[in-house]
Amino acid sequence: MPGLAILGLSLAAFLELGMGSSLCLSQQFKAQGDYILGGLFPLGTTEEATLNQRTQPNGILCTRFSPLGLFLAMAMKMAVEEINNGSALLPGLRLGYDLFDTCSEPVVTMKPSLMFMAKVGSQSIAAYCNYTQYQPRVLAVIGPHSSELALITGKFFSFFLMPQVSYSASMDRLSDRETFPSFFRTVPSDRVQLQAVVTLLQNFSWNWVAALGSDDDYGREGLSIFSGLANSRGICIAHEGLVPQHDTSGQQLGKVVDVLRQVNQSKVQVVVLFASARAVYSLFSYSILHDLSPKVWVASESWLTSDLVMTLPNIARVGTVLGFLQRGALLPEFSHYVETRLALAADPTFCASLKAELDLEERVMGPRCSQCDYIMLQNLSSGLMQNLSAGQLHHQIFATYAAVYSVAQALHNTLQCNVSHCHTSEPVQPWQLLENMYNMSFRARDLTLQFDAKGSVDMEYDLKMWVWQSPTPVLHTVGTFNGTLQLQHSKMYWPGNQVPVSQCSRQCKDGQVRRVKGFHSCCYDCVDCKAGSYRKHPDDFTCTPCGKDQWSPEKSTTCLPRRPKFLAWGEPAVLSLLLLLCLVLGLTLAALGLFVHYWDSPLVQASGGSLFCFGLICLGLFCLSVLLFPGRPRSASCLAQQPMAHLPLTGCLSTLFLQAAEIFVESELPLSWANWLCSYLRGPWAWLVVLLATLVEAALCAWYLMAFPPEVVTDWQVLPTEVLEHCRMRSWVSLGLVHITNAVLAFLCFLGTFLVQSQPGRYNRARGLTFAMLAYFIIWVSFVPLLANVQVAYQPAVQMGAILFCALGILATFHLPKCYVLLWLPELNTQEFFLGRSPKEASDGNSGSSEATRGHSE
């Protein structure tokens, strides 16, 4: 495929003066407008000998033509014309442009840069103490192409806070906002590209590589960044060197040969070549000449698409070439636009219509691009089509196109434009435009771009591979990079269909670490990690011990977490107990509601009235205490579990004790004594008994908390792969402390009711209390051995079950039968049945209640 070098660097790409008719292409590099944009493009190059022999600060003649620079300039022209022809960004305004050739040399670049900063209508930069109101000839500058030039112009324009948007300068140093506060670019920093390169090396396990850079700022900085990134990713650089720029001197030739010799001696198969196109041209020329063994060359963006390199004779002998290329939106109409402009440049009528006299800039600086007016349009047009179809130019063309749109968007924001007009009452200074460019978003075709804090844009990269088609290669996309690398292995071509291996030592297996031998960390032996340790990273040199809360088998690559083990809310046992809680609590609330509804009934009054309801409330609180047992143990929950369970139970049992005492008194003592004692057991003194019992239990709980406080324990020994967390009981004595009061109350209740003989024809309250206390003792006596033998992790579930079944036993044997009478046997809800006397007898104080009761029964 004919490349751009055939068009731009050989005699076939341009004609010397006098060969063919003159064009007026250079006269199209300026257009008037309300706001002028400066442009710096590599329209030509100069002979190196001319620069070496320069002894005076005179002008430099650019004799060779660069088609790439022309295409980039055309991209800027097309973008400006699009903006002017539309109304979305700058309605009612026109952008102008003033484009100059940099000749790819700093000396040449400074001349138009000085002209851009000259005061409007003059050719000089005035000296002021304050440049706030200074109005230069241009509002912003697009370019230059190379980082070397941008380092110079960036500092110069930053002094005046002149916005500068480069379409290709990618050096990371340009991201320094203190040095280059007004510099922006529509390409990512080289650091991003090198991160992609390091990711590519890691993907193919190429950890033994050579790194070469051009002997200039671009190459040296690239090598420095790559070296740091490679070291942090475990990639060893066997050899690092600088390649001099293309020179025919013997000294430079010796340096190139020495670089090639050291690369060969390092026995690497992969070389990262971060260099300018001219340095790569020099390196590959001698590599082909000296028959260097083929390598995998990882290219920087600066030379991956360079025709200077791609058209070298026998270039296929260098090996495989891979590199990342910034992705950009396609501009399908660009080819037609360039062809139209080139055709107009050859049209005498059109050329005659252009202004014939020299403008101010040309009088000072000479023609903008004299060599542009003597090119062969047919070769240039065909070369453009071929390079665009091969994907070698569109990313640079789009970057230039986007740079213009970024400035237009900033001007749009500064002028507060709407769909119909812009506010142009006052002139816009460059520094005002700059204020709107920081972190600004803008659109270029279908892409939304944004300047980051360092003035760069974040764009996706395509991974390109040279595929050989005689005589020159073409670029195939074989992957993408946007923070992560995506490869299309089926599209990659390798010698012998095998991916080259570039390693000093084989990769260690999983669970093995490296024992370095020699000086390079990539040369090592592999050693297994023992149990209890693991290999943290593939490039580790020592096994990392597992933490106390972790474990690992032998030859492990990770430590498995020892999951905390406790009675979780979602475990089946807990869910079952929670369902039981809902049942018991629901029955308790239903009983309480029923007794409140029938408050004045004989049954409720005979059961103790308010004391009975208080006992039910305590029973409900006793049930709710089970909610303290599931879940991850905490100090507060551990301390609260036993007191919050047994204090409500004491309140409940104390009310039952009062009823048991009343039953005992009524049955075993003379009537006169019984009436006197019952008045105390039912009156305010009854609450004193409840209070005293509760205070005794509270005192025992306080003793329990102070003398034997439970604590949250993390047990690492019980389970091999889990860590047990539980509330540890200090001793069995502590458990007995909180049960003393309740056990005594229950025992007294049992004695007071078990020995009592029920009277026929009356409700047998003693039987319900007897069975309730039996249920209490059976459950809590069974609880002790079960708690002692069950796995520690499930001890809270045992306590929950004991609490709920205890509550259910009391409820089912004592309270629910009374609810049954209230709902389904209302005819028994009488004073005779529950108190053993009629209303009349009660009022007369008659004690012959037994006969009345027997009469009711008959």
Swiss-Prot record:
SUPFAM superfamilies: Periplasmic binding protein-like I. Forms homodimers or heterodimers with TAS1R1 and TAS1R2. Disulfide bonds: none annotated. One of its GO terms (molecular function) is G protein-coupled receptor activity. It comes from Rattus norvegicus (Rat). GO terms for biological process: detection of chemical stimulus involved in sensory perception of sweet taste; sensory perception of sweet taste; sensory perception of umami taste. Residues 597-610, 666-687, 757-767, 818-858 are cytoplasmic. Keywords: Cell membrane, G-protein coupled receptor, Glycoprotein, Membrane, Receptor, Sensory transduction, Signal, Taste, Transducer, Transmembrane, Transmembrane helix. Belongs to the G-protein coupled receptor 3 family. TAS1R subfamily. It is found in: Cell membrane. It is a multi-pass membrane protein. This is Taste receptor type 1 member 3. The lineage of its organism: Eukaryota, Metazoa, Chordata, Craniata, Vertebrata. The keyword Signal applies. One of its GO terms (cellular component) is plasma membrane. The gene is Tas1r3. The chain crosses the membrane at residues 576-596, 611-631, 645-665, 688-708, 736-756, 768-788, 797-817. The keyword Signal applies. Residues 839-858 are annotated as: Disordered. Glycans are attached at N85, N130, N203, N264, N379, N387, N418, N439, N482. Putative taste receptor. TAS1R1/TAS1R3 responds to the umami taste stimulus (the taste of monosodium glutamate) and also to most of the 20 standard L-amino acids, but not to their D-enantiomers or other compounds. TAS1R2/TAS1R3 recognizes diverse natural and synthetic sweeteners. TAS1R3 is essential for the recognition and response to the disaccharide trehalose. Sequence differences within and between species can significantly influence the selectivity and specificity of taste responses.
